Amino acid sequence: MRFSVGLGKEGAEERLARRGVSRRDFLKFCTAIAVTMGMGPAFAPEVARALTGSRRPSVVYLHNAECTGCSESVLRAFQPYLDELILDTISLDYHETIMAAAGDAAEAALHQAVANPDGFICIVEGAIPTADNGIYGKVANHTMLSICSDIVPKAKAVIAYGTCATFGGVQAAKPNPTGAKGLNDALKHLGVNAINLAGCPPNPYNLVGTLVYYLKNNAAPEMDEFNRPLMFFGQSVHDNCPRLKHFDAGEFAPSFESEEARKGWCLYELGCKGPSTMNNCPKIKFNQTNWPVEAGHPCIGCSEPDFWDEKSPFYES
C-alpha cells in the first residue's frame, strides 16, 4: 500500500499548501530538523531541498517485539503532522500499524516493496526474539527472526528505531527468556550494520534528520561505538540540561515534592541518569514542547544499552 503521492521538485509548496502546511510552518520544521542535526538554522534550506526532492525512497517499516510506542512517537509529531509532510517525502510501502491492507494483501505489499528495483530503506522497531529459533515472536506465521533475516539484508539502508530495536529494550531485561536482542546483535552473522536511533521512545526528529542525511549523502552519518549518530547522541543529557547550573552549584532536590524540586534544582540525587546518558532530549524536546527532566522527572537513561538492568533502580531516596 502506498500512502503518499510525492512532493517532487515542481509545485512542492502548492502540494504542502493543499495539505494545510504553510511555507512558514514548513521552514520552521526544516529549521528544527537542522538544529537537531547539529547544523544550525542556516542548514534549513538544505533540509527543505532534501525533503522536497524528486527522489522519494521506498520505506519498509518492520515491527518486532515492542509496544508500538516508537511508531506513536512519529505519528504524534506535529509542525507539520507526519501525514502532511513525511508521507509525501517517502513512500511508506509497509507499516503494519497504519496500513489499510491486512492478511495476504499486507504480505503482498511487503514483498512488492522489497522487490523494488530502486531499493528500499528498512526501519525496524522492536527487539528480535532469538531463543528456540525465534518462536516467541511471529507475524503471519513467520518468526520475527526469519522475517528480519530475509528482509533487512536486502535494504540499501537500515535504521533501528527505538531502544528495543537498537539494544533489546525491556524485552531483553533479565532473565530475558525469549532471547530478545537488538537488530545488529541478532543479525550480526548476516553483516547487518543498522543506524541505531535509541530512546524509549525515540524522538521523531532524530528519525527525520537521519532520513534527510541519507537523502542528501546516500550514506550513514558518523556514528559512535554503539552505531548511534553523533549528531544526535554526541553529548550527554547532562551537558545540555537546564538544571545543570544547579548541579554545578551543588543544589540538589531532596525529594520530588520539595520546594527545591519545584524551583528546578538538580535531580541527580533522586536518581537522574543524565550524566551517563547520550541523547539530545534537552535540545529538541518532544514536539519542541517538553521532556522528562524539564517536567520534573529524572532521566532514566533510556537511550543506553541494557538500561532496564544497568540503570535501575530509576529512583533514589
Curated annotation (Swiss-Prot):
Residue positions binding [3Fe-4S] cluster: C281, C299, C302
EC primary class: oxidoreductase
Localization (cell): Periplasm
Keywords: 3Fe-4S, 4Fe-4S, Iron, Iron-sulfur, Metal-binding, Oxidoreductase, Periplasm, Signal
A GO BP annotation: anaerobic respiration
Coiled-coil intervals: none
Family of this protein: Belongs to the [NiFe]/[NiFeSe] hydrogenase small subunit family.
Subunit text: Heterodimer of a large and a small subunit.
Name listed for the protein in its UniProt record: Periplasmic [NiFe] hydrogenase small subunit 1
Organism for this UniProt entry: Nitratidesulfovibrio vulgaris (strain ATCC 29579 / DSM 644 / CCUG 34227 / NCIMB 8303 / VKM B-1760 / Hildenborough) (Desulfovibrio vulgaris)
